[in-house]
Amino acid sequence: MSGFLRWFGGNRSKDTTKDTIVRFQEMLALYDKKEEVLERQIAEQTEIARKNATTNKRLALTALKRKKMHENELVKIEGSRNNIEQQLFSIQNANLNFETLQAMRQGAEAMKSIQRGMDADKVDQIMDKIRDQQTISEEISTMISTPVGLNAEIDEDELANELDELQQMELDSKMLGAEKPPVHTPAVPAVPSQVKDLPSISKPQELDEEEELRKLQAEFSL
């Protein structure tokens, strides 16, 4: 098998293997056509022999001989076809195995190249460095977030005590306010803020009313 692989994959290019496979497939197609022709010829000679079996024995025997020749040729073609199919199957399997082996070899080389500069000790050293840097980063963040200046001098406990005192004073004030008796103020009716103006009578209207009054008095005097 190793020599077979070297012939198809080692010393020859991949194109050689592909060309061989294509060539075998073409031969199988040719054998298919040849078998169809021989089978048709066998059927034709069989029909000729049947038709002339009683009327023309000489022609019938000749047809049977040709039929036998075609049958023998068909057997040879079928044998050659089987051999080609077996070879093609073997070549395809060998090529598949070779390609698989090549892929596995390339994968191993790639892993070797990737891991060339790595081992357990180096990985452990790198992880230690990462942890150290993380610790330093946390310390820096803590230092940066620590108040400085006036804020750093403020006593949080003192502020809390002062706040408690203010809250107690507020509660005491509310309690004192609640103890005083409520003062009731009698309700005073609301005074209109503005008096509506009475309608004024115009002077012409007053003259008309006086005139009408005099007319009434004159009528009653009559």
UniProtKB/Swiss-Prot annotation:
The keyword Coiled coil applies. Keywords: Coiled coil, Cytoplasm, Endosome, Membrane. GO terms for cellular component: cytoplasm; cytoplasmic side of plasma membrane; ESCRT III complex; mitotic spindle pole body attachment site; multivesicular body. InterPro entries: Snf7_fam (IPR005024). The keyword Phosphoprotein does not apply. PANTHER family: CHARGED MULTIVESICULAR BODY PROTEIN (PTHR22761), GH13992P (PTHR22761:SF10). A component of the endosomal sorting required for transport complex III (ESCRT-III). Required for the sorting and concentration of proteins resulting in the entry of these proteins into the invaginating vesicles of the multivesicular body (MVB). This is Vacuolar-sorting protein snf7.
